């Protein structure tokens, strides 16, 4: 075996090292001099950080830094032009807003509510990264913001097919991101809002309502505010979803990333009290193919059950008899008007709860454990306890085999997701 590739980079003030790990090799990063951060998290001098194959990383310094990389990289270069100052200014404006609202609350004996910021823009402009940076800066300032992710295709809080929220109490791990402790999660069950618009809107409104209810008695979370990530669908019905989400979450700041027409349209549509800002995307953002997106979804599901290299999880596999659970899905085929009795109105087929019978077709699909029940008719707007993966269906024994984070099922109502995953149990 040959010696591993070693590269050293000297970064000047306000510069950024961007690198991509190779297809089959990890890269070890070390800060050997100066100060640097990765997506808003400070990195420790002389500590080694192991990034897995295919990682895309940006190391920024406000002062100067010397970075050493060990391992094969697909690319590695220093960029002198970055939007980090813009992101810092956005954070500073949010913090100033928090302080003003604290002062106003003291004078009128009210409960202060922090700023609520919505990040919008097309695919591959870096919305998830910016949300991570802003959350990290808020935490470093002593705040506890709520990270909301409405991107059902590439969710950063829970599994694909979810809308979810997380109270951020510590900065993200440099390699693994935020700890996903006790998130609020709703199972949408699709990787694009277009697959069931009525359900998508119903769920993000339910999520907003749940957050508002929970932070009513949590002063720190309420003052920390919200940083809301969205999907990359910005035209037609996707645009309408953005406007409705802004209203549902009562946002007062909207950041538009790299889309001037969207900025113009929103400036005419949103209320005057909403502060709208257009910012450029980072030059380090790369276009992702459909294949890469699919692979990322698979890695996200794998992480949900098995954790990461630094934080392993050990899920359970066990059999569940058909007659001990109720399987259902949300949404049904629309019946034509001609098939309905005279005078009967068409109900919303997109939010109809349908009982499904166990069959081999559900193998490899995710199911959520609903906090609601069919009997109480509240499955539609109930959050979930968690998820399981159907690994086998035995029609003779009338059992399903599931992969589950717990050794027992937390709910007998399981809600179907179109998201699938082949559990190869490959350690990553």
Swiss-Prot record:
Any one of the GO BP annotations: tRNA splicing, via endonucleolytic cleavage and ligation
Key words, A-Z: ATP-binding, mRNA processing, Nucleotide-binding, Nucleus
MF GO annotations: ATP binding; polynucleotide 5'-hydroxyl-kinase activity
UniProt cross-references to SUPFAM superfamilies, sorted A to Z: P-loop containing nucleoside triphosphate hydrolases
Pfam families: Clp1 (PF06807), CLP1_N (PF16573), CLP1_P (PF16575)
Classification via InterPro entries: Clp1 (IPR028606), Clp1/Grc3 (IPR045116), Clp1_C (IPR010655), Clp1_C_sf (IPR038238), Clp1_N (IPR032324), Clp1_N_sf (IPR038239), CLP1_P (IPR032319), P-loop_NTPase (IPR027417)
Cellular localisation: Nucleus
Region (Disordered): 99-118
Annotated residues for binding of ATP: 16, 56, 124-129
Main location: nucleus
Any one of the GO CC terms: nucleus
Domain of life, per lineage: Eukaryota
UniProt function note: Required for endonucleolytic cleavage during polyadenylation-dependent pre-mRNA 3'-end formation.
PANTHER family for this protein: CLEAVAGE/POLYADENYLATION FACTOR IA SUBUNIT CLP1P, POLYRIBONUCLEOTIDE 5'-HYDROXYL-KINASE CLP1
Family: Belongs to the Clp1 family. Clp1 subfamily.
Protein name (database record): Protein clpf-1
Gene name per UniProt: clpf-1
């Amino acid at each position: 075996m040959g010696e591993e590739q070693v590269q050293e980079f000297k970064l000047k003030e306000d510069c950024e090292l961007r690198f991509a790990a190779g297809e089959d090799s990890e890269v070890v990063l070390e800060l050997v001099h100066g100060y640097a951060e990765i997506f808003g998290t400070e990195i420790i001098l002389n500590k080694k950080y192991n990034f897995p194959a295919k990682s895309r990383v940006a190391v920024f310094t406000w002062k100067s830094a010397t970075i050493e990389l060990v391992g094969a990289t697909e690319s590695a270069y220093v960029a002198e032009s970055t939007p980090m100052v813009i992101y810092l200014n956005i954070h500073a404006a949010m913090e100033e807003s928090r302080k003003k609202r604290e002062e106003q609350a003291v004078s009128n004996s009210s409960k202060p509510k922090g700023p609520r910021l919505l990040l919008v823009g097309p695919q591959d402009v870096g919305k998830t990264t910016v949300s991570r940076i802003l959350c990290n800066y808020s935490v470093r300032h002593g705040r506890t913001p709520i990270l909301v992710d409405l991107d059902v295709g590439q969710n950063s809080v829970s599994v694909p097919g979810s809308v979810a929220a997380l109270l951020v109490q510590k900065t993200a791990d440099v390699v693994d991101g935020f700890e996903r402790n006790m998130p609020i999660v709703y199972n949408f069950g699709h990787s694009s809002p277009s697959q069931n618009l009525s359900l998508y809107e119903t769920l993000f409104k339910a999520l907003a309502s749940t957050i508002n209810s929970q932070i009513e008695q949590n002063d720190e979370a309420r003052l920390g505010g919200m940083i809301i990530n969205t999907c990359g669908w910005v035209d037609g019905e996707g645009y309408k979803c953005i406007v409705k989400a802004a209203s549902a979450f009562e946002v007062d700041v909207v950041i538009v990333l790299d889309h001037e027409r969207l900025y113009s349209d929103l400036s005419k549509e949103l209320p005057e009290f909403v502060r709208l800002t257009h910012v450029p995307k980072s030059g380090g953002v790369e276009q992702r193919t459909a294949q890469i997106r699919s692979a990322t979804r698979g890695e996200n599901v794998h992480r949900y059950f098995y954790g990461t290299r630094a934080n392993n999880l050990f899920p359970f596999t066990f059999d569940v008899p058909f007659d001990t659970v109720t399987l259902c899905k949300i949404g049904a085929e629309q019946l034509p008007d001609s098939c309905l009795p005279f005078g009967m109105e068409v109900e919303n087929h997109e939010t109809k709860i349908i009982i499904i019978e166990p069959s081999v077709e559900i193998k490899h699909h995710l199911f959520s454990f609903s906090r609601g029940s069919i009997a109480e008719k509240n499955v539609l707007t109930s959050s979930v306890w968690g998820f399981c993966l159907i690994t086998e269906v035995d029609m003779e024994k009338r059992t399903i085999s599931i992969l589950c984070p717990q050794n027992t099922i937390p709910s007998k109502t399981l809600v179907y997701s179109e998201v699938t995953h082949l559990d190869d149990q490959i350690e990553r």
